[in-house]
Amino acid sequence: MSGVMCLKASDTWASGIRSQPQGCLGKWRSMRCKHTRMHLAHLGNSRQLISLGPPRTREDGSRISQQVEQSRSQVQAIGEKVSLAQAKIEKIKGSKKAIKVFSSAKYPAPERLQEYGSIFTDAQDPGLQRRPRHRIQSKQRPLDERALQEKLKDFPVCVSTKPEPEDDAEEGLGGLPSNISSVSSLLLFNTTENLYKKYVFLDPLAGAVTKTHVMLGAETEEKLFDAPLSISKREQLEQQVPENYFYVPDLGQVPEIDVPSYLPDLPGIANDLMYIADLGPGIAPSAPGTIPELPTFHTEVAEPLKVDLQDGVLTPPPPPPPPPPAPEVLASAPPLPPSTAAPVGQGARQDDSSSSASPSVQGAPREVVDPSGGWATLLESIRQAGGIGKAKLRSMKERKLEKQQQKEQEQVRATSQGGHLMSDLFNKLVMRRKGISGKGPGAGDGPGGAFARVSDSIPPLPPPQQPQAEDEDDWES
């Protein structure tokens, strides 16, 4: 309303100016400008001006207002963070305890930055708007040669029909192209010659000359260059020491300051820190500082070890479980030979003598021997399993013989089951020889095979005899 009233007032001022004499016209004009400025200043609020505009202007104004409100909220959030940080600083400002602050090397910003959004999100792109097209429905008039000739009589036109002379110059590249933008493009590289004016096409193979063998021989006969002075006059050059431009930092002289070791009640200085002189390398090597280790927290609490005390004496740990009893030897084992039975008997006698030497341990019950039940139970279980002559032990020599016999029997069975003529015969002869020599089983063990019976019926070969002289004479005759 104020804007409308201002316009009406200006109309009345204009009508008053027309009725006034011409001498006061400048004065009224200056007063009208001052009043207009005062009215515009009293409006103040931009929304009233926007509301008076067209709908497009009001829509743009509302979008700008929303953007301003959003920016104002962001500024308010930043102000809250600043006030919070200021409060933390004020809280630790008066304390005298040392505080370690580990700042993050990463800027406190989200991992994915938010893209800037335009305030005209709902506006339609003017490039996509469709504009009305008007199609003119008219046909082109045909060319009238007669009318053209009549007009040429009144309007003389000089048209040159002579063709333009072509540029047949041998030098230069011809006319300038349209895409050249600088003068340097016209010149040859590192020269002042204009390529489009003075440029001659040269054939690189036109002046090629092939060298003959005579010319090559003449070149090789040329003398060598003179030797350097260091060889001809045998002079030695002094080796120049290269200058070192590397900077080596130095500690220099540190002034001695006589100050007390402890300064109490200093404002802004922590009183719970102690600095110890480092005896390692100095500051001259300029080694990078080590990263401090941050404290780690564990949620699991380790339980303390509980020790049982009985009458002020520590109880020993529980004894280990006894081992399983030794497996009994099969009854089908062959009897021991007399050579191996003797040492076993001697060992049994020694065990009997040792058992008679300690009758208390042998006859006493298990609980009386050792009430703690540690190593005694283990030894007792070994004794009961056959430690004192109860076990049917065999010597190592007997075990080796048994294993060897088992391997030979398995080989004979494997070869006899195959049914091959030559293999069966060979194996049977081997077994027969072993039986004769006494190293293996006899021929009457009954092994299977195709020629087992035939080989059994073959008599042994007679011993070789010396031929007599009569036989030799008969053979010669």
UniProtKB/Swiss-Prot annotation:
Keywords: Actin-binding, Endosome, Membrane, Transport
Region of interest called VCA, as start-end residue ranges on this chain: 362-477
InterPro entries: WASH1 (IPR028290), WASH1_WAHD (IPR021854)
Keyword Membrane: yes
Subcellular location: Early endosome membrane; Recycling endosome membrane
Major site of localization recorded for this protein: membrane
Job description of the protein: May act as a nucleation-promoting factor at the surface of endosomes, where it recruits and activates the Arp2/3 complex to induce actin polymerization, playing a key role in the fission of tubules that serve as transport intermediates during endosome sorting.
Name of protein: Putative WAS protein family homolog 4
